Regions:
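Short, low-complexity N-terminal intrinsically disordered segments enriched in polar/charged residues
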Residues: 2-52, 56-57
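A general secondary-structure boundary signal
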Residues: 31-34, 55-58, 63-66, 127, ...
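Short helix-to-loop capping/linker segments positioned immediately adjacent to catalytic or ligand/cofactor-binding
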Residues: 42-43, 102-109, 141-143
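Hydrophobic pocket/interface hotspot
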Residues: 42, 54, 91, 131, ...
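A solvent-exposed, acidic/Ser-Thr-rich amphipathic alpha-helical stretch
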Residues: 60-131
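A beta-strand edge to alpha-helix "cap/lid" segment located at domain peripheries
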Residues: 14-19, 111-113, 120-185
Length: 185
């Protein structure tokens, strides 16, 4: 075998020089502590059923706000159905409904705890930061359920503090049978 060439199982020969010249992945930046604290607050308020406080984290401009749980990560929200596809008005309506306590699918109410981890900044400009995180949500209502996936938060920095303008939740088991999402995921 020639110099600089190496045999790799099943008769496959790889040029050793090109094998080492491949682009290595680089870590994404971590969110700053203020952004992480905001993500943890959003998760805690949802877990504790503090719906009005959770809603207050959202920006007020209806044309940019999006809360979505697609059936598939590549789905176009304009042309496909989603488990949740809310604008700002719909978020307000969802929270008002949750606050009544009159949801058959939440009687008794779920007890929830979620873990948000592996958070990475995927985009940032002067006013906004987009963070992707893994999440695991443990829900107990009559029996235990487990929800997991990747969540994308876009947060705007403003004079009145941080405001959520986009939350997209990609469930691991999206596309399959999903029980009711009668809570904030």
């Amino acid at each position: 075998m020639g110099r600089g060439r190496r045999r790799r199982g099943a008769g496959v020969t790889v040029d050793a020089a090109s094998e080492h010249s491949r682009t290595r992945p680089t870590p994404r930046p971590l969110p700053d502590p203020e952004i992480l604290a905001f993500l943890y607050l959003e998760a805690r308020l949802a877990d504790e059923g503090r719906y009005s406080e959770w809603e207050s984290l959202w920006a007020d401009d209806d044309d940019t706000v999006e809360y979505r749980v697609p059936m598939h990560p590549d789905d176009d929200p304009r042309t496909t159905l989603a488990y949740i596809n809310d604008n700002r008005r719909r978020i307000k309506s969802r929270v008002a409904q949750l606050n009544t306590g009159n949801r058959h699918s939440q009687t008794p109410p779920s007890v929830m705890r979620r873990i948000v981890s592996n958070s990475e900044v995927v985009a940032e400009d002067a006013d906004t930061v987009t963070v992707e995180s893994n999440f695991a949500l443990f829900e107990y209502r009559i029996r235990q359920r487990f929800w997991a996936g990747r969540v994308i938060h876009t947060i705007r920095r403003s004079a009145d503090g941080l405001r959520l303008i986009r939350k997209v939740v990609h469930l691991v088991d999206a596309g399959g049978p999903v029980e009711t999402l009668a809570f904030l995921i």
